[in-house]
């Protein structure tokens, strides 16, 4: 098996300089570079350098305001709501995590809602901030439609990340970092580029409803990008367990969230 090594410090340096060159403040660029490098340390490369394209394309499309700053719009002793103001999720989620940690330190527990932000990369980074303070934490959000309801032919559901971490004394933490659907656009691009099947028959043909693991007929590259691909097939959620967790996360991130968008 081929082993690859990389210099995380150079990666952070390069990402920071790229985002600042695009117009970001230094603190904004620090958050982006830190989270992308963290995903590489974790071994989740699709949530690392590749996911930079997600905020770059949002910037190019005018969906991301690189000079906007997230702000707290409501709060109480154990809760808060942060409006991302169309900034990146990297900045917004760091603010949310820091606020939750600060409130939990005095109250024992806290929940912070957020919204109106763009991609945030690996959510593992934000729960790990709590672990560094000897706290347990959960973090998630909903996404653009990447999965179909049971029996559906078109994507209506998100593919939410779910990260949780619990300190374990002098041992490694109990740590979960999963997706609550079967695949992301990065999995489609990886399969297309390397001409390999997905790990399951999760593609739903929008006309026939047939299932497939072959992305060839459905995947289409977006000019100028490598990791972000269009896919004309819908995504299947394979088990009722994953489906139920997907619905639970949607309720938490979009329905009870004061500024959530289902």
Predicted regions: what they are:
Residues 147-221:
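Phosphate/diphosphate-binding glycine-rich loops and adjacent basic-rich segments that engage nucleotide
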Residues 23-31, 46-49, 258-262:
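Flexible, glycine/charged-enriched surface loops at secondary-structure junctions
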């Amino acid at each position: 098996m081929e082993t690859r090594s990389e210099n995380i410090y150079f990666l952070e340096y390069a990402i920071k300089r790229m985002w600042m060159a695009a117009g970001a403040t230094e603190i904004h660029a620090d958050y982006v570079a830190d989270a992308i490098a963290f995903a590489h340390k974790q071994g989740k490369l699709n949530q690392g350098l590749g996911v930079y394209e997600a905020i770059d394309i949002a910037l190019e499309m005018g969906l991301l305001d690189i000079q906007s700053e997230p702000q707290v719009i409501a709060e109480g002793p154990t809760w808060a709501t942060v409006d991302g103001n169309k900034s990146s999720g990297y900045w917004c989620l760091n603010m949310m995590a820091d606020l939750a940690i600060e409130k939990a330190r005095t109250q024992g527990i806290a929940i912070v809602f957020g919204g109106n932000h763009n991609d945030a990369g690996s959510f593992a980074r934000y729960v790990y901030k709590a672990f560094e303070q000897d706290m347990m934490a959960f973090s998630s959000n909903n996404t653009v439609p990447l999965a179909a309801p049971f029996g559906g032919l078109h994507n209506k559901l998100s593919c939410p990340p779910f990260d949780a971490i619990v300190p374990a004394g002098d041992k490694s933490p109990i740590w979960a970092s999963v997706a609550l659907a079967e695949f992301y656009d990065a999995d489609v691009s990886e399969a297309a580029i390397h001409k390999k099947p997905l790990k399951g028959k999760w593609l739903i043909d929008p006309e026939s409803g047939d299932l497939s693991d072959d992305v060839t007929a459905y995947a289409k590259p977006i000019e100028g990008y490598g990791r972000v691909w269009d896919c004309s097939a819908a995504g299947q959620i394979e088990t009722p367990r994953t489906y139920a967790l997907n619905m639970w996360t949607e309720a938490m991130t979009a329905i009870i969230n004061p500024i959530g968008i289902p």
